[in-house]
Amino acid sequence: MKKTALITGFTGQVGSQMADFLLENTDYEVIGMMRWQESMENTYHLNDRINKKDRISIFYADLNDYSSIQKLFETKRPDVIFHLAAQSYPKTSFDIPIETLQTNIIGTANILENIRLLKAKDDYDPVVHVCSSSEVYGRAKVGIKLNEETPFHGASPYSISKIGTDYLGRFYGEAYGIKTFITRMGTHSGPRRSDVFFESTVAKQIALIEAGLQDPIIKVGNLSSVRTFQDVRDAIRAYYLLSLESAKGKVPCGEAFNIAGEEAFKLPEVIDILLGFSTRKDIKVEQDKERLRAIDADYQMFDNTKIKSYINWKPEIPARKMFEDLLNHWRDEIKKGNIPLNR
């Protein structure tokens, strides 16, 4: 019998790429969880398959609505859950801290509690990927590579919410034997990356300038950060491989893993790389105070040793290729008439 995979956050960048990966590389039946009001711009290419029920379907539910999550698990019983849904924008979390905490912590608890109850009732035993974030490490010391034992130091309401999510994944694994594993992904990007994130807003603005829709000035926030970057498609491959090992019982319940790129950049270097792909050579950069966070994680470098000891994985897509694909994504969106907001 074919396995069923549930993807929460199906319409987001990571969720939509996860659906693509599973449909192309497995025989899984895929269930995409989404809210009624969500945009499907990242999943338009799957609509025909969804309409034909060709190995993919949609289930409407909301992380904050326990009854809809309960109905989802009672009726579908997925074999593997990739829990990717979240309020995932650190800067936005300063504006809506309560909603961020509610969605990310209580929403995750709603999923795990439903699984716990079904496991106690009739031995329901799925694999559960709980997506945390490298933001849990917050303001790390310069020169230190972050590993899974590095203390948490939340630097935004978002990062604090992900600390809670991380602990929930570990607790439900250790206390109830649910096959949870937690991932702390470093900065990831590529096609479909939301423009609220640094490299994507830079790429979007370049595409707008090339199309004559914006003056040749890129507006940015903090430029002092040093980050590793990886292509989201590399991260998704790691998620899938970890889920296979978890299903075999080779990943301890509640285990956490860093997943990060191995190419580090200062943010001005990211701008220079993207500008190098542009057809315009007159673009200037201007700092915008409205884009600054109250506090930021300025330095993040990672140690991937642990995950490599569990699965045969390493980042394969070069960061420069990822940045070029991101810029081309925005060029394509603008050509289609999908003019984004200035943010």
Regions found by a protein language model. Name each.
Residues 1-188, 329:
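N-terminal Rossmann-like NAD(P)+-binding domain of SDR-like oxidoreductases, especially those catalyzing
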Residues 3-4, 13, 25, 319-343:
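Amphipathic terminal alpha-helices
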Residues 64, 95, 103-106, 149, ...:
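Residue-level signal for the nucleotide or nucleotide-sugar donor/cofactor binding architecture
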Residues 142-144, 167-243, 262-267, 271-277:
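NAD(P)-dependent short-chain dehydrogenase/reductase
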Residues 202, 245-292, 304:
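Mid/C-terminal beta-alpha module of Rossmann-like enzyme folds, strongest
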Residues 213-218, 242-259, 334-341:
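Core catalytic loop region at the nicotinamide-binding pocket of NAD(P)H-dependent oxidoreductases
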Residues 235, 239, 259, 270, ...:
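Non-catalytic, hydrophobic alpha-helical segments
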